[in-house]
Amino acid sequence: MTEPLLPEPAVKPLLRQPGGRRRLLLIDDELSVARFIAHAAEECGYEAIITVSAESFRSQYLASDPDVVVLDLALPRSDGVELLRFLAEEKCRALVLPISGFDQRVLEAAVRLGTALGLRMAGPLQKPVRLQQLIDAMQGREAQDAGCIGF
């Protein structure tokens, strides 16, 4: 599990070896939630990259070319909508899974916005996230390709 420390150094692109592990990039200001998600992803063979700020998320996204993005909608100095727009501008091909403690209607609106922006959306998940909910949200081609039930 990769946890950038603040302040973060310049990010070097992570070159994936042919046949290398899939990458999951997540942003969450609650480190315990981020570690929980990262651990679940790593158990299914993903390389998990944790970010805690919008700035580090952007730089890690550009450097890592993730297969899955887990996006907390409520961040201290940013919000998930801003990051959804960033992902759309970057023509993100990753599966995007929004999570938050917000009301379910807000989460569903984020999924609709992401879809309208051309993103591949999954979920959403309301905090506190349960393992089975996380696994169910991640079902799809990524799950089958990774050879792990749920991821």
Language-model-detected regions and their locations in the chain:
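Conserved sequence signature across two-component system core domains
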Residues: 24-28, 51, 69
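Short acidic/polar segment at the start of the alpha1 helix of CheY-like receiver
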Residues: 30-34, 106
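Short hydrophobic/Thr-rich beta-strand motif most characteristic of the beta2 strand and flanking loop
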Residues: 45-53, 60, 125
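Acidic catalytic/metal-coordinating carboxylates
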Residues: 52-53, 79-85
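Active-site residues of response regulator receiver
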Residues: 72
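The feature encodes the CheY-like receiver
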Residues: 76
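Alpha4 helix (beta4-alpha4-beta5 surface) of REC/receiver domains from two-component response regulators
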Residues: 82-85, 102-123
